[in-house]
Amino acid sequence: MNPIIYTTLIMTVMSGTMLVMISSHWLLIWIGFEMNLLAMIPVLMKNFNPRATEAATKYFLTQATASMMLMMAIIINLLYSGQWTITKMFNPVAMTMMTMALAMKLGLSPFHFWVPEVTQGISLQAGLLLLTWQKLAPLSVLCQISQSINPNLMLTMAMLSILIGGWGGLNQTQLRKIMAYSSIAHMGWMTAVLPYNTTMTILNLLIYITMTLAMFMLLIHSSATTTLSLSHTWNKMPVITSLMMVTLLSMGGLPPLSGFMPKWMIIQEMTKNESIIMPTLMAMTALLNLYFYMRLAYSSSLTMFPSTNNMKMKWQFEHTKQMKLLPTMIVLSTLVLPMTPALSSLN
C-alpha cells in the first residue's frame, strides 16, 4: 500500500476516535464511529490475502450491525427526550440497545466471537491497532453514560467476558488469538468497575494499552506468531525473550508487576460498594488467564526446544529494526505497582 494513503487512513481512524471522545452530540458520535470503521477496513487489509479479506469483512459486518443498533437507540432516546445531547437515557429499551451496541464494538461477551477471528487474520501491526486504539471510542461513550447503564446487565457481560477470555485462551497456540482472548478478559475487568467508578476504568484502560503495546512490539520484534516460533526466540534474542516473559506475567496480573495494580484496585472498589461475590469470582477466573500466560512464559524462556543448531546461542544475531519506544513500554508495563497509592488518590 502507498505510504501516503496508509498514513491518511491511520489519521482518519484517529480523527474518528477523537471526534467520538470530544463530542456531546449523538449524531457526531455516530459519524465518528463510521469514519473510524470505513478507514479501518483498508488498514486491516494492508497485507492483501484471503485471510485478511475475510477478517476485514467480519469486522465490517459486526461493526455495521453495532452502528445500526446504536443509531436505533439514539433515535428511540430522541423520541422520548427530544434532545441529541448525551444526557441521562430516558428509555430503558434505548439504554439496553445502546449498551449492547457498544459491547459489540468493544468485543464484550456474548458479542465477542469476531475478536479472535479478526485478530488472527490480520498482521501484528493491525492487531495492535485493533486491540488498543479501537477500544478508546466505545469505552469513552460508556464512561459518559455510565450513570444510566443497567448495572446488572453490565456486570453480567463483564463476568462472561472474563470467563470467556480465560477459557478461550487455554488451548490456543496462535499468539494473536491468545492476545485477542486476553483483550476480551481485560475489557471484562474494565466494564465490571464501570458502574461504580469511571476513573478506575480509564486507569485500567491505560495500563492495558501499555502492556498490550509492549507485548505486540516484542512479538513484532521477534516475528513470532505461534507458540512454536516463540519457543525458538531464546537462541536468537535472549534479552527480548526475557522481557517478553516478564511482560506476559504482568498481563496475567502477577503481584510485583504493573498488571496486578488494576485488578487490586478494581476488587477494592467493588468491595467498597458492598459487592463481595462478584470480585471473588472475577479473581478466581483471572487464574485461567494467568495459567496460559505462565504457559507461554515457560515455553518461551524456560525450555530449550530441539534444534538443528547444537549451540545454545547463535554467534550472529539477525538484524532487527530498533524500537525506541520499547524500553519505555516495558518499564511502564512492569514497574508501575509502587505508584498505586498516588493513583488510588485520583478517585
UniProtKB/Swiss-Prot annotation:
Supply the EC number(s): 7.1.1.2
Q: Membrane-spanning residues where?
A: 3-23, 25-45, 59-79, 89-109, 149-169, 178-198, 200-220, 237-257, 274-294, 325-345
Q: Might you report a single GO cellular component term?
A: respiratory chain complex I
Q: Where in the cell is it found?
A: Mitochondrion inner membrane
GO BP of this protein:
mitochondrial electron transport, NADH to ubiquinone; mitochondrial respiratory chain complex I assembly; reactive oxygen species metabolic process
- Can you state which reaction this protein catalyses? a ubiquinone + NADH + 5 H(+)(in) = a ubiquinol + NAD(+) + 4 H(+)(out)
One GO MF term attached to the UniProt entry: NADH dehydrogenase (ubiquinone) activity
Q: Which Pfam families match?
A: NADH_dehy_S2_C, Proton_antipo_M
User: Where's it mainly located?
Assistant: mitochondrion
User: Can you tell me which residues the record assigns to a coiled coil?
Assistant: none
Swiss-Prot/TrEMBL keywords = Electron transport, Membrane, Mitochondrion, Mitochondrion inner membrane, NAD, Respiratory chain, Translocase, Transmembrane, Transmembrane helix, Transport, Ubiquinone
Q: How does it sit in the membrane?
A: Multi-pass membrane protein
**How would you summarize the oligomeric state and partners of this protein?**
Core subunit of respiratory chain NADH dehydrogenase (Complex I) which is composed of 45 different subunits. Interacts with TMEM242.
According to its UniProt entry, what is the function of this protein?
Core subunit of the mitochondrial membrane respiratory chain NADH dehydrogenase (Complex I) which catalyzes electron transfer from NADH through the respiratory chain, using ubiquinone as an electron acceptor. Essential for the catalytic activity and assembly of complex I.
Family statement: Belongs to the complex I subunit 2 family.
Q: What's the protein here called?
A: NADH-ubiquinone oxidoreductase chain 2
Q: Which gene encodes it?
A: MT-ND2
